[in-house]
Amino acid sequence: MHSHILPKTMPNWTQKFGYGKFIHLEPNADGSANMMQGGQFFRRIVENCWDEQLRIEEYKPFHTQVQVVCTIPVMFSYWAQTADALELSRFLNDHIAELVQRYPKNYIGLATIPMQDAEAAILELERAKSIGHVGIQIGSNINDENLSEEKFFPIFEACERLGMAVMIHPWQMMGFDSMKKYWLPWLVGMPAETSRAACSLIFGGVLERLPNLRVCFSHAGGSFLPTLGRIEHGFNCRPDLVAIDNPYNPRTYLGKFWVDSITHDIDALEYILKMQGSKRV
């Protein structure tokens, strides 16, 4: 399964770039830190978010051999100007690459790239591979555009060419402004976002055009696998709406992508294993 990590310190990007609500850290007296989005509190994090040795000690009791580490999705900054997002991506990617170099038996790194600009994204993708990253983590949508949009295809094509895996993580959740109560964007929106990404890549023909592209959908694929029957039914009964870019049944793609095992429920995990097979989880 994946996990998130940040450097212990980082620049105040909002002050440096002069706009936006970039994330920066404000340390607390108890050793924790506040993630600040511009000038607003976003989340409190504790030492295991940046202390690599503490993380190793924490996962030892679970007999975990290695952690896949990547940034926290709010750091993506796809809304930012390309040059600034690229600088931020390089900073985060260098941090993870250095971590993996120090602990090669304990960590595997996934990079972040400025998806809002394909040329810059591919340049950083190539650089990330050269410094030891084995893949990238990207959002479930890019500034509310689906991953099936043709502008993103060259990035996926480069990932296939370079052998760089793609882990898709939900972010910028649909319905965020209309269901803030009860933390629903994370509880309801996140699984839906992951299914949105899976459906987009399948129905948009990206997985068909790039059969060697290695894609992993986080959080066990979100709501995609549990609702595959409904998705397939829609494909069969309304091909005029669903099968307009790819004529193949979405069920045929089972086993052609990966999901991680983060279900928080043993029965759900057993269902995912039944659907995907253990080698794709």
For the regions a protein language model found, what residue spans apply to each?
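Helix-coil boundary/capping segments in enzymes
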Residues: M1-V281
